[in-house]
């Protein structure tokens, strides 16, 4: 009678004949090399270190943000790459006073940015109008009246360290978002600002004054008579100037 082989011996014989290198073995280290996550977390993780800001500086607050570009603070380590086109940016940093004439341009830039997009209101003049909110008729009292703001950064002006803190808090918000929240740009919480007390004034440039011919025509009695020079006067003056 042939001796019976154990299952372990049979497995070793098969491994030696079928696969000389041996069968793959699952080790305990494999569980440490697999990350289980959702599509939201993967998408948010990829965007955390790739926020491309569009710099919209209108006043002195932007000088503090310009200090971040230097080697002392080095904002490149956060993945911030300034863009000059709103179609390539996903973060709008508004730094400085926003006037009534610049408001349409700001809204147009925000609308040209692709989704998802975020806004940081930097400085007191951007958030509430600052010192211009009391009696100025040209300053916007809060940029959140024009576009939705995700993060308020108060200060006059804020320090570069405060800007870093704002970017870190914005990254936390981005990391906790879901797919359904990316399309919602409505702002739920707004900064307390004073409303504009202005009256609607129609434009005076209607063109009606051009149709009033009586206002443009000078009466004949008030017209001054033009004194005509003799014909030989100009010729004699030219001849005398040439001879001299």
Curated annotation (Swiss-Prot):
Cofactor: [4Fe-4S] cluster
Uppermost EC category: translocase
Gene that produces this protein: ndhK
Signal peptide segment: none
Location in or out of the cell: Cellular thylakoid membrane
Catalyses which reaction(s): a plastoquinone + NADH + (n+1) H(+)(in) = a plastoquinol + NAD(+) + n H(+)(out); a plastoquinone + NADPH + (n+1) H(+)(in) = a plastoquinol + NADP(+) + n H(+)(out)
Assembly: NDH-1 can be composed of about 15 different subunits; different subcomplexes with different compositions have been identified which probably have different functions.
Listed name of the protein: NAD(P)H-quinone oxidoreductase subunit K
Recorded family membership: Belongs to the complex I 20 kDa subunit family.
Residues that bind [4Fe-4S] cluster: 60-61, 125, 156
One biological process term in Gene Ontology: photosynthesis, light reaction
Record's function text: NDH-1 shuttles electrons from an unknown electron donor, via FMN and iron-sulfur (Fe-S) centers, to quinones in the respiratory and/or the photosynthetic chain. The immediate electron acceptor for the enzyme in this species is believed to be plastoquinone. Couples the redox reaction to proton translocation, and thus conserves the redox energy in a proton gradient. Cyanobacterial NDH-1 also plays a role in inorganic carbon-concentration.
E.C. code: 7.1.1.-
Originating organism: Prochlorococcus marinus (strain AS9601)
């Amino acid at each position: 009678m042939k001796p019976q082989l154990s299952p372990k011996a049979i497995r070793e014989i098969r491994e030696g004949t079928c696969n000389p290198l041996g069968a793959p073995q699952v080790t305990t280290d494999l569980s440490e090399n697999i990350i289980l996550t959702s599509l939201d977390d993967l998408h948010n993780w990829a965007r955390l270190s790739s926020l491309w800001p569009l710099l919209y500086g209108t006043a002195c607050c932007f000088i503090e943000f310009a200090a971040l570009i230097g080697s002392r603070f080095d904002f490149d380590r956060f993945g911030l790459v300034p863009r000059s086109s709103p179609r390539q940016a996903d973060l709008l940093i508004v730094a400085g006073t926003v006037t009534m004439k610049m408001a349409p341009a700001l809204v147009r830039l925000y609308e040209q940015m692709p989704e998802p997009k975020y806004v940081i209101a930097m400085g007191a003049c951007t958030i509430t109008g600052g010192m211009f909110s009391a009696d100025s008729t040209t300053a916007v009292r809060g940029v959140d009246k024009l576009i939705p703001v995700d993060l308020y950064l108060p200060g006059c002006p804020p320090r570069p360290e405060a800007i870093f803190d704002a970017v870190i808090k914005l990254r936390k918000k981005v990391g906790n978002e879901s797919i359904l929240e990316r399309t919602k740009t409505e702002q739920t919480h707004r900064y307390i600002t004073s409303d504009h007390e202005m009256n609607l004034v129609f434009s005076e440039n209607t063109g009606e004054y051009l149709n009033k011919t009586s206002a443009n025509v000078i009466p004949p009695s008030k017209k001054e008579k033009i004194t005509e020079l003799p014909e030989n006067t100009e010729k004699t003056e030219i001849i005398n100037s040439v001879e001299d």
